Amino acid sequence: MTQTDRDAENGRDREKDREKEQQRGVKRPIMPAAVPEPVQEQIQANFIVVIHPGSRTLRLGRATDTLPISVPHVIARRHKHPGQSRYEDKCLLREGLNSADSNEQRQNGLKMVDQVIWSKKMSNGVRRTPVSAEQARLYNRQIRPAVLDPNSKVSWTNTSHHPEYVVGEEALYVNPTDCYSVHWPVCRGRLNLHSGSGGSLSAVMMDLEHIWTHALQKLLQIPLKDLKYYRCILLIPDIYNRQHVKEIVNMLLVKMGFSAVVVHQESVCATFGSGLSSACVVDVGDQKTSVCCVEDGVSHRSSRLCLAYGGSDVTRCFFWLMQRAGFPYRDCQLGNKLDCVLLQQLKESFCHLDQDISGLQDHEFRTRFPDSPVLLYQLRLGDEKLQAPMTLFYPAAFGIVGQRMTSLLHRSQGDAEDPHDEHFLLTTQSKQDQSSKASADRKSFPKPSSFEGESSVCEVSDRSSLGQDLDLGHSQAECLVGGAETEETPSALLSRKTAMSQFEGKALGIDKAILHSIDSCASDETKRKMYSCILVVGGGLLFHGAQEFLQHRILNKMPPSFRCMVESVDVITRPKDTDARVCVWKGGSVLACLDTTQELWIHQREWQRFGVRMLRERAAFVW
């Protein structure tokens, strides 16, 4: 056999071996699936839905809409079994009001409010005319309602066809005698989980899905089968529950069928909606108040603060004050949802924060309920209209005892679906810091030539100990996380721990919360920016005179060192002359049109494959 024949034979053998390997398959190292880079594509804004879920009101609309559609965030579900007990989430009542110390705390809080009212003069330099509740009560007790119309032309929601559920305004007007339970799925900015009927996570998520799909179909005229062509921008609180956000995103993408989702924070979107680059954002909602410092589209984590009170607490306090003044509508009950709607309207109509309005004034209001005549009431009030909104600055007057009223941002508890979370990063960073420090120490230590052998032994020992360090158990990992936290500057760590222990146990007034939030910023320049622009959004502080009142309190309480640095303290309560209640939603619609938003979209297939990891990779804030 010639050399040429042998080469040809060897070539055929190699080809056969290659075919056998292909048939058997070649073992390759298993690489973890990488999160894909966001795809740049042209998106039409009229196919983007912006959703802002509040505790009391759901606001949603297309990004091209001028204003959102507002719907009461409530659902009434038909009982599944005959004789099932009726359950109803309360609108104005809450835990902590029935404590033995509640009344005393409320009275002490109102005394502080009265002292502030009497201590401040009116703009003309004259002190306010003192008015006692007894003066108003003598008049109001004599009032009897006048019948304007025997038929109110308001009817209960028709449930004769036994719908499984009704939502929004219809849910408010379900007859209490019907076999329906009423649920508000969001409470104080979080999912309303409780031990009662309909309080499980799955039940609350079902309520959310039904309310939102109803609003999309009936109010935005978007068929559910077309949601695969739409995208969604979800606005969440600054201090959020990660598990709740994860469940809502899963509902939007998997159950409802949106093609993609962007999740962003309310405070940042508030600055977008008001056209500001930097501001201390104060969001006074119905059940919670959030304070956060935003700079160039970034929310400072250390400045986030959530107060567990809002406009509904002011409404309840206003009702107590009116009762003390002989409120003529004597059948009014805080447990009745229609009475709560009436009290909310009275608060918005009568209350103010204008020190120049003093003395007794006469008012009138109407009641219009199903199966009842339209009644006209006369009402005389004095300082009650000023006292009620001032409780936002003296929350002890709410009489809430035994509840955590202030929340700061806590470290993530981790998620089983996202192993490379904050805990992992902190642990890795700590180990890298320790390793680099040890290496630097070895390099800086002089090594005599006579001990070269020992030096090599020491290096081997160091490497082996480092390998053991990488195999730390769970408890050791927790220690490292804590150690990483202490690697922060001692002053920052001390101030954060002190703040948590000092403030979470008691209720802060809005002005004190603003001062604390700004003081948590890292630099004096950032603090100066925040003092210069305080943006108030939400519907809880929409009172006449609120802008001047808040500005006066901030100026009086801000640190003296900043008074010369800050040219003026601007408090903005009506950004661009728009309704402060829709400012956050407007910011979401602006976000939909930004070029940088292209990088934030989480697509349905990506979510199904990678899950909550996508929020960490794509969210515009630190997840």
Swiss-Prot record:
This is Actin-related protein 8. GO terms for molecular function: ATP binding. InterPro entries: Actin, ATPase_NBD. The keyword Secreted does not apply. ATP binds at residues 283-286. Component of the chromatin remodeling INO80 complex; specifically part of a complex module associated with the DBINO domain of INO80. Exists as monomers and dimers, but the dimer is most probably the biologically relevant form required for stable interactions with histones that exploits the twofold symmetry of the nucleosome core. It is found in: Nucleus; Chromosome. GO terms for biological process: cell division; DNA recombination; double-strand break repair; regulation of DNA-templated transcription. Signal peptide: none annotated. Residues 1-29, 428-458 are annotated as: Disordered. The keyword ATP-binding applies. Residues 428-438 have a biased composition (Low complexity). Keywords: ATP-binding, Cell cycle, Cell division, Chromosome, DNA damage, DNA recombination, DNA repair, Mitosis, Nucleotide-binding, Nucleus, Transcription, Transcription regulation. GO terms for cellular component: Ino80 complex.
